[in-house]
Amino acid sequence: MEFDGEAQAVEPTSRMLSWARNSALYRLQQRMMTEKQLRDAIMRKAREKFEDIGPAQVKALGEFAVTFAYGIKALDDTAYAEITVRSGQRSGKSKRGLAQKLQIKGVARETATAALQETNDLVAAVIFARKRAFGPYRRVEPDEKRKAKEFSAFARNGFSFEIGAKVMAMTTEEAEDILSDAPL
């Protein structure tokens, strides 16, 4: 492909590679990322930073950054999935919601499934109810409108109707027993 008589370069320059390495280091120091997130971020920023960069160079920079990150052991999708799942469970996120989040972040289905095996939707639902003052943690007597609102909130957050009904029917003591027995 030619633009204005010049052939588009296929290989990234040493300046581009150095920038990709430094940018990957900076991003991974700021937060834990998946392989897909790092590749996409480097490719997006490379298009912004370098004016005459071609699609092949952009892709090569993304791959270089990912390879570099794996080389220094700063990128690990399995650890990312496990940490995300544990954090989500502690904050009351459903297994379904966590699976969707991992899929969006680009974690492989097998890795996400392995990380999600230890999760317990009942524990997460009780935590969610405690955060929102639903079910056993309700401060006022519910009317039908309030119950419908609470069931809707459970459903929107990925919990099944059965789990929502189970949590809504619990006493505070039963809910606290579930939380005390749960490994968080």
UniProtKB/Swiss-Prot annotation:
The lineage of its organism: Bacteria, Pseudomonadati, Pseudomonadota, Alphaproteobacteria, Hyphomicrobiales. It comes from Agrobacterium fabrum (strain C58 / ATCC 33970). The keyword Cytoplasm applies. GO terms for biological process: regulation of DNA repair. Belongs to the RecX family. NCBIfam families: PRK00117.4-4. Its main location: cytoplasm. It holds the Pfam family RecX_HTH2. It comes from the Bacteria. Keywords: Cytoplasm. This is Regulatory protein RecX. It is found in: Cytoplasm.
